[in-house]
């Protein structure tokens, strides 16, 4: 079950969005009436995502979205606005907002936007994990190549023989070749 924070200065809108999301299996872990409260709730609850109005008192939704994104206080943010404004949309894109929903909102517009945002977020997170694994494998390969080169120089071995030597030594020591190379 996904954990959600709803931030809107209008209590009736928060209640309506809560009802829609809860009826679709989401858990509302917090509500906020301004951007600053949204940040505070996110720090406490660490939601999967936030649905936040743009125009709120104290701190706007866009300002709060920037803090939430930069401080990794939630998986992602979706913006809710009464305005079809290119400038707001451009700012939302710059802050990696995952969804832009124009009021009035109803279940038929909210739920597809939420599902698409969740799907895009999952794909983005998987790409980050894959990138991290690839970077780690590349780093491991660099260590192995460096160790292999040192063995080739010190023992006057071919590349293939140096690799076999590393493999044999790692098996004797009971550690991975990467650990040995480091």
Language-model features: where?
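Two-component/phosphorelay signaling modules centered on CheY-like receiver
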Residues: 11-30
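Acidic catalytic/metal-coordinating carboxylates
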Residues: 34-37, 60-63
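Active-site beta3 strand of CheY-like receiver
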Residues: 45-51
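Active-site residues of response regulator receiver
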Residues: 53, 81
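Receiver (REC) domain active-site loop signature in two-component systems and cognate sites
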Residues: 56
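Alpha4 helix (beta4-alpha4-beta5 surface) of REC/receiver domains from two-component response regulators
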Residues: 63, 84-99
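C-terminal output/effector regions of signal-responsive regulators
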Residues: 122, 129-182
């Amino acid at each position: 079950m996904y954990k959600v924070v709803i931030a809107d200065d209008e209590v009736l809108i928060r209640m309506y969005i809560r009802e829609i999301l809860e009826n679709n299996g989401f858990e509302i872990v917090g509500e906020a009436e301004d951007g600053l409260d949204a940040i505070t709730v996110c720090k406490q609850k660490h939601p999967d995502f936030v649905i936040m109005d743009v125009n709120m008192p104290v701190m706007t939704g866009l300002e709060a979205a920037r803090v939430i994104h930069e401080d990794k206080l939630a998986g992602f943010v979706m913006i809710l606005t009464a305005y079809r404004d290119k400038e707001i949309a451009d700012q939302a894109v710059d802050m990696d907002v995952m969804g832009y929903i124009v009021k009035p909102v109803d279940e038929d517009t909210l739920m597809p936007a939420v599902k698409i945002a969740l799907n895009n977020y999952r794909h983005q997170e998987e790409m980050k994990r894959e990138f991290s694994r690839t970077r780690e494998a590349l780093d491991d390969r660099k260590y192995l190549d460096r160790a292999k080169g040192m063995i080739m120089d010190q023992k006057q071995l071919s590349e293939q023989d140096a690799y076999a030597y590393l493999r044999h030594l790692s098996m004797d020591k009971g550690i991975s070749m990467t650990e040995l190379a480091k």
